[in-house]
Amino acid sequence: MDMTWFEQMEARIPKGEVRTRFAPSPTGYMHVGNLRTALYTWLIARHSGGKFILRIEDTDQERLVEGAVDVIYRTMAECGLDHDEGPDVGGPVGPYVQTERRELYGKYADLLIEKGHAYRCFCEKQEETEGFEKVADPCRFLSREESDAKASAGQPYVVRQKIPGEGSTTFHDEIFGDITVENSTLDDQVLIKRDGLPTYNFANVIDDHLMGITHVVRGSEYLSSSPKYNLLYEGFGWEIPAYVHCSPVMRDAHNKMSKRHGDPSYEDLIAQGYLTDAVVNYVALLGWSPGGEREIFSMQELAEIFDINGISKSPAIFDIEKLKYFNAEYIRAMSPEAFAKAAEPFIRQAVKKPEISAAAIAALLQQRTEVLTDIPEKLDFFDELPEYDTALYIHKKSKTDEAGSLEMLRAMLPVFEGISDWCDENILAAMTGMAEKCECKNAKVMWPVRIAAAGKAVTPGGAVEICRILGKDETLRRMRVGIEKLEKSLG
C-alpha cells in the first residue's frame, strides 16, 4: 500500500497546543448534558490558550433533523462558546462535517485491514454488533486474497475491527483513572457500514487524530467503548488523546435527564424565562467544583479557574430551584436598561396599553423576579382592574378595615385630584401628609390606596409606584370604584 497520502495527512495535523472538539450530531435541540460537554470542552481549550473545534457528526443519516445544525450554531453563539475552527469558519484540517470526509474513512479502514487490525465481513447479518460473536464469524479468518476476491466481485460487506482474542486492554481516563477490560468481552464492532459510511465509533477516532485533538470530552456512557478506541489508536500507531468522561446529568437520583420525559433542553429553559448567562453558569457547576463557596462566575472567570481535577465521578442532579436562584442573582446584577429589554416581551404579554411604560414596570420587577415567565401574572391589574373582594382592605399589620379604608379613600381622592405634577415625590408627599394629618402610620393610608389601584394584595411595587405608572386619571377612576365597592359592602 502506498503510504504517501497518509503521510501527507499526518503532516497537516497541528502540533504543540491543546486542541479540543465539540462534535454534536444534528438530531434536535441541545439538551443540558450536551451543553455541559460543549462548555467543558471550550473551557479546557480556553484555560490552556488552545483551540476549540466544532465538528458536525452526521453519519447517522436516519436521525438527522432539518435545521438542527442551525440550532447548534445559534446555541453556541448565545452561550459564548466561540470556536476557532469549524464548518462555518474553516480551518487547517477540514472539512469539519463527517459526511464531507467520507473518502477518508474508507482509506483508513483499508489501512487498518492492511495492518491486520480489521477485516471485511461479507456475512448476511445485521450490522449492529450487539451479541456478535467474533469467534463464530468465518470472515475474520479469511485470507487477504479471499477477502480481496469477494470485494472485487462486488459482494457487499462491512468492515469490522479485529479485537485480539486474548489479553486485556487498559485505558486511562482523567476522571476515572486506569480501567482494564478483558479483550474477550469486546466484540468486533462495525467500522464501515455497507453503504460506505463510517460508524460513529470509527469516524470520531479518525477525525480526532487527523484534527490533532488532545483532549476528548464526552459522557461516561462511552467508557465501555474506550478500550476499542484505544485498540484503534494502537492499531494505527497513533498517540492516544486524554479522555475526560463526564458522569451523566440526572433528573433525580435514579433517572437521567431525557427530552422524552419532558426534561428541558437549553432552548426550553430560555423559553421558560431563564437567562443564558445563568444557565451556562449553573451548567458549569453540574458535576464540577471550583473549590470554595463562590458560585457566580463569568465565562472569562470560569476559563481562568477551570480544572479537570474538579470534575466529579458522581452523577449531577439537575435542580430547577437552584437554577432559579442563579437566575435571580443574574437578574439582580443586570443594568436596569438590560433588564428592561429582556423583560419587555413578558411585560407586554400582560400590559398591552402603549401608554403604560414597560421600562417603568421593569424597574419595579427587577429585584422581585426569579424567572422572566413569572412576570405576566404579576401584572394582570395594569390593563384592567380585576374583580376583587373588599375583604382585601382588611389588613391587621396596617391596621385597616373596610370602614377605615372607605374613609381614607374619600379623604385622599381630592388630595390626589389637586396634584398637578403626577410623580413619585408628589404622590408620596400627598399620602404621608394625610398620615400626619390623621395621626396614623403611612401604611394606613397606602394600603387602601394600593388595593383600590391594583385590586390585589401582592403587587410589584407599592402604592406610590403603581399610582404613578397607572397615571392620575386611571388612579382616580379606580379609587372611585373602590369607594363604590366599599359603600355597597358596608350598606
Segments (PLM) and residue ranges:
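Non-catalytic terminal extensions that flank enzyme cores
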Residues: 1-29, 49-52, 166, 244, ...
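Residue-level signal for inorganic ion chemistry
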Residues: 41, 72, 112, 116, ...
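Active-site cores that bind ATP or allylic diphosphates and position pyrophosphate for catalysis
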Residues: 111, 119-245, 251-257, 265, ...
